[in-house]
From Swiss-Prot:
Its main location: cytoplasm. Its EC number is 2.7.1.23. Keywords: ATP-binding, Cytoplasm, Kinase, NAD, NADP, Nucleotide-binding, Transferase. Its cofactor is a divalent metal cation. One of its GO terms (biological process) is NADP biosynthetic process. It holds the Pfam family NAD_kinase. NAD(+) binds at residues 45-46, 121-122, 147, 149, 184, 221. GO terms for cellular component: cytoplasm. This is NAD kinase. It is an enzyme of class 2 (transferase). The active site is at residue 45. GO terms for molecular function: ATP binding; metal ion binding; NAD binding; NAD+ kinase activity.
Length: 265
């Protein structure tokens, strides 16, 4: 089995990576950062997002394992003190995995050119200065004209990030859906939006047509400047992200440990 290691620049992460590489090689596992079967991230959730985008073209054939170098992250199942247990799980790997939905974003330029991007967490359209004005289409029909700071579209696992801060719901990843939330929308007697998050199932599309060219499009940790973009289309991707399920933590337990203190009985 071929294993890649993707770590952040923190000194602690680099030291743990060195120890991990030595242990993997000692146990007969191959390090291959080009065409791996397993990608181990050493860092936090941001490191895992970076690894996802780095290996996005191989997403069908790889599984991720998150090793956190601080407190346990949302996507990470292992602590730096558990290297021996992790290596043991890798040596006894039988292909077990758990899969989550992804966001497919299509950027359509005025020239007609289209570019596809995949996001693990979310995408957002924001106006750095002034008000973002955009027409929102659902079911192929004009639904509303949005005015505000921006719009975010999240996957179920990404629903605990920017989406949650926007007042969106936390979706379980067994729901094959995406969620659109408003960022500081303008609602008064003249301008109205629905004012609530929208959950769209697989097979349907959210189309956003901004009325200006001065906006930013962000997906996970990447950014696109909105120049000569005619529309953006969002849907549940056909592909999924896969994690090695050696001792996979239940989704609601992840939410609990990320946001809720222990409850005294």
């Amino acid at each position: 089995m071929k294993i890649a290691i993707f770590n952040n620049d923190a000194k602690n992460s680099q030291m743990i990576t060195q120890s991990l590489v030595a242990s993997l090689e000692k146990n007969g596992l191959t390090i291959d950062n080009q065409h791996p079967d397993i990608v181990i991230t050493v860092g936090g959730d941001g490191t895992l997002l970076g690894a996802f985008q780095h290996y996005v073209d191989q997403i069908d054939t790889i599984r991720f394992v998150g090793l956190h170098t601080g407190h346990l992250g949302f996507y990470t199942d292992w602590l730096s003190t558990e290297l021996a247990n992790l290596v043991s799980s890798l040596t006894h790997d039988n292909g077990q995995r758990v899969s989550y939905p992804l966001l497919d974003m299509t950027v359509v330029h005025e020239s007609g050119e289209q570019y596809h991007f995949l996001a693990l967490n979310e995408a957002a359209i924001k106006q750095p200065v002034g008000t973002l004005v955009a027409d929102i289409y659902l079911g192929g029909q004009l639904f509303e004209r949005f005015r505000g700071d921006g719009i975010a579209v999240a996957t179920p696992t990404g629903s605990t990030a920017y989406n949650k801060a926007n007042g969106g719901a936390v979706l379980h990843p067994k729901l094959s859906a995406i969620q659109m939330s408003e960022i500081a929308s303008i609602n008064n007697r003249v301008f109205r939006t629905l004012g609530s998050p929208l959950v769209v199932p697989k097979g349907e599309e959210i189309i956003v047509k901004p009325k200006s060219n001065h906006f930013l499009v962000m997906y996970d940790q990447s950014e696109i400047k909105g120049r000569h973009i005619n529309e953006l289309r969002f849907r549940v991707a056909d592909k999924q992200v896969h994690f090695a399920a050696y001792r996979h933590v239940d989704f609601w337990q992840r939410v609990h440990r990320a946001f809720i203190n222990d409850i005294e009985s």
